[in-house]
UniProtKB/Swiss-Prot annotation:
Keywords: ATP-binding, Cell cycle, Cell division, Chromosome, Cytoplasm, Cytoskeleton, Kinase, Mitosis, Nucleotide-binding, Nucleus, Phosphoprotein, Serine/threonine-protein kinase, Transferase. The lineage of its organism: Eukaryota, Metazoa, Ecdysozoa, Nematoda, Chromadorea. InterPro entries: CDK, Kinase-like_dom_sf, Prot_kinase_dom, Protein_kinase_ATP_BS, Ser/Thr_kinase_AS. It catalyses: L-seryl-[protein] + ATP = O-phospho-L-seryl-[protein] + ADP + H(+); L-threonyl-[protein] + ATP = O-phospho-L-threonyl-[protein] + ADP + H(+); [DNA-directed RNA polymerase] + ATP = phospho-[DNA-directed RNA polymerase] + ADP + H(+). It comes from Caenorhabditis elegans. This is Cyclin-dependent kinase 1.
Length: 332
């Protein structure tokens, strides 16, 4: 539990922190961007998550563009976005200090019993809160790009928060994480898988669709082990896209005319529990999912539209961290 040695450079901000202001307690994980430690703010005694960012070119130091971009993320203050409290540079290393939450959505789902599903009201509440956070960030032109259950953190009061916003653009997504585990493709939008150079907020909406489906079934919807396998798993469930439903798909760099032509859509079958004979998503929930998994990114539901989908009509928002926020810019 030794204090970290004095940082030479601290972030600019209201309270200037150095690494000496934090005590490392234990390593809690290895994320997409490097090692994560549980730590303590020695000024406030609050628990924090300390991310030591692994940079591809450590010998060259931290790119100033990355520091600038990351510093902007301190402005993303929303009750459903994990707060970035400080950006600290030490030599050529970068530490990001975040508020601490001990549990992520994946661990929460993993500890449910074998035949136990997420309660329907929790499924709805979590989905709504994820969309609230996404809408807030998208309106500020920040795309997540690497959304998955591991970077959705939950607390004991029914809140869910998005972590690692904007880091994909600031740092880039590595192919592998620290442990040489391949960064998951299961939540990646088809336009990225087919090599689109320019993409939009729609990539996050696709990821939310995949996460919504997984919260309902406890199983990843498209569990590919390579980019082409991921793509074909999507095609097998939704049908292979054509120019008819996705204008421009055949012009994408990695589109191949030789792709197998699956024609049927089997999405509904994924939500049928054979044991109980029940559908895990009702018609309005399924309609929201279909809107999030539209192939053409320009037709895919955006976060603001998703927040007013009929699925959320009877939503009790009184106890949610961001209340009834549905994309009104002036709220935060």
């Amino acid at each position: 539990m030794d204090p970290i040695r004095e940082g030479e450079v601290a972030h600019e901000g209201d309270s200037v922190y150095t690494l000496n202001d934090f005590t490392k307690l234990e390593k809690i994980g290895e994320g997409t961007y490097g090692v994560v430690y549980k730590g303590k703010n020695r000024r406030t005694n609050a628990m924090v998550a300390m991310k030591k960012i692994r940079l591809e070119s450590e010998d060259e130091g931290v790119p100033s563009t990355a520091v600038r971009e990351i510093s902007l993320l301190k402005e993303l203050q929303h009750p459903n976005v994990v707060g970035l409290e400080a950006v600290i540079m030490q030599e050529n290393r970068l530490f990001l200090i975040f508020e601490f939450l001990s549990f992520d959505l994946k661990r929460y789902m993993d500890q449910l019993g074998k035949d136990e599903y997420l309660p329907l009201e929790t499924l709805k509440s979590y989905t709504f809160q994820i969309l609230q956070a996404m809408c807030f960030c998208h309106q500020r032109r920040v795309i997540h790009r690497d959304l998955k259950p591991q970077n959705l953190l939950v607390d004991n009061n029914g809140a869910i928060k998005l972590a690692d916003f904007g880091l994909a653009r600031a740092i880039g997504i590595p192919i592998r994480v620290y442990t040489h585990e391949v960064v998951t493709l299961w939540y990646r939008a088809p336009e990225i898988l087919m090599g689109a150079q320019r993409y939009s907020m729609g990539v996050d909406m696709w990821s939310i669709g995949c996460i919504f489906a997984e919260m309902a079934t406890k199983k990843p919807l498209f569990q590919g082990d390579s980019e082409i396998d991921e793509l074909f798993r999507i095609f097998r469930v939704l049908g292979t896209p054509t120019e008819l439903e996705w204008n421009g798909v055949e012009s994408l760099p990695d589109y191949k005319a030789t792709f197998p032509k699956w024609r049927e859509n089997f999405l509904r079958d994924k939500f049928y529990d054979k044991k109980t004979g029940k559908h895990l998503l009702d018609d309005t929930a399924f309609s929201l999912l279909e809107g999030l998994l539209i192939y053409d990114p320009s037709l895919r539901l955006n976060a603001k539209k998703a927040l007013v989908h009929p699925y959320f009509d009877n939503m009790d928002t009184s106890k949610l961290p961001a209340g009834n926020y549905r994309g009104e810019l002036e709220l935060f």
